[in-house]
Amino acid sequence: MEAHNQFLKTFQKERHDMKEAEKDEILLMENSRRFVMFPIKYHEIWAAYKKVEASFWTAEEIELAKDTEDFQKLTDDQKTYIGNLLALSISSDNLVNKYLIENFSAQLQNPEGKSFYGFQIMMENIYSEVYSMMVDAFFKDPKNIPLFKEIANLPEVKHKAAFIERWISNDDSLYAERLVAFAAKEGIFQAGNYASMFWLTDKKIMPGLAMANRNICRDRGAYTDFSCLLFAHLRTKPNPKIIEKIITEAVEIEKEYYSNSLPVEKFGMDLKSIHTYIEFVADGLLQGFGNEKYYNAVNPFEFMEDVATAGKTTFFEKKVSDYQKASDMSKSATPSKEINFDDDF
């Protein structure tokens, strides 16, 4: 924490001025109508909510019967990797937890944004249910995944928790900094998890896991981009060096995570490629917050080309039909309006 405080001292004056100016930010100003939905005032934020609403899915849609058969054909190392990945995913979801999202929702003073966060809180329950379903289907009992007992003591998990404490839970953090850090948590933490699961399911096995992974990855991309959208509404923004610091810190933590907690080589993947992919995701996120790329990384995974990445193909540039259930697509008669982060708000 000392190094963190020392870094921020460089920006002490401008951060103090920004803290004072937060009360005048239109998103944060006291609003007596913050619980009254109509008329809609923030159309871009409302559109973001309606798009995630259209993407709604349930745990019951994930069928794991074929996955259970396919799982038995994997190598022991691959089975262990999936068990560890599920254990760490459940742990990571606890880092997101409802408390953090509720705090963001409480600070935001418009019903459009509160609706988005409320929907995310509900979906977090579904993600936990799906991960637990997989543990039950593949391993029968969490006790059969030894890592569950060790998670709390893993240095990499502690580093993620410390990152959240430094940048999000810390009362001294600016609202804009918290948005960037939350986007990093949603977009960078677990980026390699999604890539490794797509790598496995690209082999045309485990269709239930493939569907769940695609849904959750898509949703996380939407939550990440929502932070970018709120950030775009702010009148005053942090120094680009602070944004860069937040994102690159998250990258180093995530690289360490795959070097130590999830040895991807045993799963059949290349560690260097995972690291490059994390950097690629980070570059997109930096651009989403108006920064230049830091790593200039190229996506090493062809199978990830169609996966939404923050800053590369933003959630808000996709039409609602991309996220609707197939049964509802035919009902959409009006094309959605595309939103540009360069618009004046």
From Swiss-Prot:
GO biological process per UniProt: deoxyribonucleotide biosynthetic process
Keyword Phosphoprotein tagged: yes
Temperature dependence: Optimum temperature is 30 degrees Celsius.
PTM annotation (Phosphothreonine): residues: 334
Listed EC numbers: 1.17.4.1
Gene Ontology cellular-component annotations: cytoplasm; nucleus; ribonucleoside-diphosphate reductase complex
Catalytic site positions: 131
GO MF annotation: an example: ribonucleoside-diphosphate reductase activity, thioredoxin disulfide as acceptor
One of the Pfam families matching this protein, by short name: Ribonuc_red_sm
Misc: Present with 88884 molecules/cell in log phase SD medium.
Entry's family note: Belongs to the ribonucleoside diphosphate reductase small chain family.
Protein name as catalogued: Ribonucleoside-diphosphate reductase small chain 2
Species the sequence originates in: Saccharomyces cerevisiae (strain ATCC 204508 / S288c) (Baker's yeast)
